[in-house]
Amino acid sequence: MESLHARLFPGLSINIQRSNGLIHPANISTVNVEKSCVSVEWIEGGTTKGKEIDIDDVAAINPELLQLLPLRPKDSLPLQENVTVPKQKRKSVNSKIPALKEGLRSRSTRMSTVSEVRIPAQENEMEVELPVPTNSRKQFAIPSHPRASCSTVTELPLLMVSEEAEEQAHSTRSTSSANPGNSVRRKSCIVKEMEKMKNKREEKRAQNSELRIKRAQEYDSSFPNWEFARMIKEFRVTMECSPLTVTDPIEEHRICVCVRKRPLNKQELAKKEIDVISVPSKCLLLVHEPKLKVDLTKYLENQAFCFDFAFDETASNEVVYRFTARPLVQTIFEGGKATCFAYGQTGSGKTHTMGGDLSGKSQNASKGIYAMASRDVFLLKNQPRYRNLNLEVYVTFFEIYNGKVFDLLNKKAKLRVLEDSRQQVQVVGLQEYLVTCADDVIKMINMGSACRTSGQTFANSNSSRSHACFQILLRTKGRLHGKFSLVDLAGNERGADTSSADRQTRMEGAEINKSLLALKECIRALGQNKAHTPFRESKLTQVLRDSFIGENSRTCMIAMISPGISSCEYTLNTLRYADRVKELSPHSGPSGEQPVQMETEVMEASSNGTSLTGNEEEELSSQMSSFNEAMTQIRELEERALEELREIIQQGPNWLELSEMTDQPDYDLETFVNKAESALTQQAKQAKHFSALREVIKALRLAMQLEEQASKQINSKKRHQ
């Protein structure tokens, strides 16, 4: 094989075989002795192509290279007994033998021995002078030969090959010519490397498949998201948990933002949902958000949120109350205003936390924050330091639904929110009830909760669709001393839950979102001590205006979240809203956990993730802006229409009274005529009110049409995404 390496050099033309079986000539560009291969190039279709071929393949396709091994000059000389050739003193031999022709390479010539060849002396023109040893001064000369037979003589030494090499080459040629398509070719180095890589990939896939099967046996694969459940379980094993306990100290905050996780309910357990929320410490919460990569690989994106307090599913209402609303009770005895909000998705446990344990439509009000705060109020009221203030405890309970206020303790009477001459917000007609003990408060809570507006959503069949506000008022000699407002906010997912609902539901969702945004801005303004508080943006913040102003005002927000995987999006929205209220960074907590990503090689058939481009977001934003403008216009025109109607009713004649007067058998006709004339005169004076009412109703109809059109455009855009 070393002799074959010597025959191969850059520029030599050899035959090669392509992958499709085609054999054609190509030129050698490089020879790699270490890898035992050569690189060849050829021109095809006007472009230069190349490949790498093993030396063994070259020998198999070009067997003539094995036959044309050159002989050294000394091997072509006859051996003579009386001639000794010293190795160091040999003189050069000048030869005029012509170059070997290409046609002779394919000729098979065999010679037995060189000594059998007899060359006439007169035909040789080559003279070789050999040195003679010192003890013998004789000279020997090779006979010369005539020039005519030089070509025949020079062919014979160069074409000498061993019999074994000739037989091997002959068998190779005969096999290749007989079955050219079935000839076994040795593979190049690149092909061998590719096959090694392929084998490694197949081995790795087999190992991963076995690992997945083994893991699947450890988990119930009937669960829809058992892969995510396994990843979450493996992640929780690595966590160091230090949950909140009753013995932990209570910290004083002007704005306290907490989060509470509820356990999985019966519906979620029946659907075999998994818990995607972890509470590793008393102020940190993790959301294990399920994700899919582009190649449909499942993984978790663990997002961290830091709050003042974080309650897991084992925390009771008593523990939540101890760290949230209880510190605020002291504030109202010091002449301040305190507010506690329960915010979150429908079905996340807001009403359970604020009002008490729910059993169907009935509620145990004694286990809620409403009743707990009332008990503490009476305990402090009876203490010696506050006994001399002669404080009286009053309660009110009202709801805000679609921008309107209703008294839950007065047969759900509609109330008006106005500002007096001192720019104080007054809820006209709101009934305040004097209570003397906690049991009286519980009765009021049960009575008001039964009248609260509710509706059906995907998450809850009996969902509270209004903001319920329970207020505890402390008065001394008729003057307000302190006020504690406990607010159970409406669910924050209504807009997404009813994408194809009627106008009433759309207006309901728009009002809820508007009030929640206004509430966030008011709380942030309170925390940053801003001069301006945007409380006029919604009825909710307008009613609670005095809770956002003043140095002695404190607020607590309890963000309620659902742990199920189907509520993950709403849970993240709730946590982001609560995070923006106080703008706490997830990296400012004591643990300093960083978001982590976990991966598993699980392939799925499809992905439900959608994304919006910049143009689509701008178009949807403009349509949403038009929808919000139409909703605001509808609210304003509705108020104006009601005012005009109220004026007509109050100042207009009482035609019903005249009609009832005629039902009397002995009514006074003179009196009837006088009242009828007076009524007609009043009717004429009210023409401007009728005209104004007509214009307002016309504008209201146009605004409703614009709202309907904007809503259809938004829904159509969402369906096409």
From Swiss-Prot:
PTMs per UniProt: Phosphorylation by AURKB, regulates association with centromeres and kinetochores and the microtubule depolymerization activity. Ubiquitinated.
Stretches assigned to the Kinesin motor domain: 254-584
Compositionally skewed regions (Polar residues) per UniProt: 171-182
GO-annotated biological processes: attachment of mitotic spindle microtubules to kinetochore; cell division; establishment or maintenance of microtubule cytoskeleton polarity; metaphase chromosome alignment; microtubule depolymerization; microtubule-based movement; mitotic metaphase chromosome alignment; postsynaptic cytoskeleton organization
SMART domains with a match to the protein in the record: KISc
Modified residues (Phosphoserine): S3, S19, S92, S106, S108, S112, S162, S171, S183, S188, S515, S626
Residue numbers spanned by region Disordered: 164-188
Positions of ATP binding: R260, G344, Q345, T346, G347, S348, G349, K350, T351
Keywords: ATP-binding, Cell cycle, Cell division, Centromere, Chromosome, Chromosome partition, Coiled coil, Cytoplasm, Cytoskeleton, Kinetochore, Microtubule, Mitosis, Nucleotide-binding, Nucleus, Phosphoprotein, Ubl conjugation
Effect ascribed to mutating D295A: Loss of microtubule depolymerization activity
Residue span of motif Microtubule tip localization signal: 95-98
GO molecular function annotation: ATP binding; microtubule motor activity; microtubule plus-end binding
Coiled coil segments of this chain: 614-652
Highest taxon above the source species: Eukaryota
GO cellular component term of the entry, any: cytoplasm
Pfam families from the UniProt entry: KIF2A-like_1st, Kinesin
Region spans: Globular: 1-250
Matches recorded under InterPro entries: KIF2A-like_N (IPR054473), Kinesin-like_fam (IPR027640), Kinesin_motor_CS (IPR019821), Kinesin_motor_dom (IPR001752), Kinesin_motor_dom_sf (IPR036961), P-loop_NTPase (IPR027417)
Subcellular location(s) of the protein: Cytoplasm, Cytoskeleton; Nucleus; Chromosome, Centromere; Chromosome, Centromere, Kinetochore
Region described as Negative regulator of microtubule-binding: spans on this chain: 203-234
Domain remarks in the Swiss-Prot or TrEMBL record: The microtubule tip localization signal (MtLS) motif; mediates interaction with MAPRE1 and targeting to the growing microtubule plus ends.
Task performed by this protein: In complex with KIF18B, constitutes the major microtubule plus-end depolymerizing activity in mitotic cells. Regulates the turnover of microtubules at the kinetochore and functions in chromosome segregation during mitosis. Plays a role in chromosome congression and is required for the lateral to end-on conversion of the chromosome-microtubule attachment.
Similarity section: Belongs to the TRAFAC class myosin-kinesin ATPase superfamily. Kinesin family. MCAK/KIF2 subfamily.
Quaternary state and interactors: Interacts with CENPH. Interacts with MTUS2/TIP150; the interaction is direct. Interacts with MAPRE1; the interaction is direct, regulated by phosphorylation and is probably required for targeting to growing microtubule plus ends. Interacts with KIF18B at microtubule tips; this interaction increases the affinity of both partners for microtubule plus ends and is required for robust microtubule depolymerization. Phosphorylation by AURKA or AURKB strongly reduces KIF18B-binding.
The protein, known as: Kinesin-like protein KIF2C
Species name: Mus musculus
Gene behind this protein: Kif2c
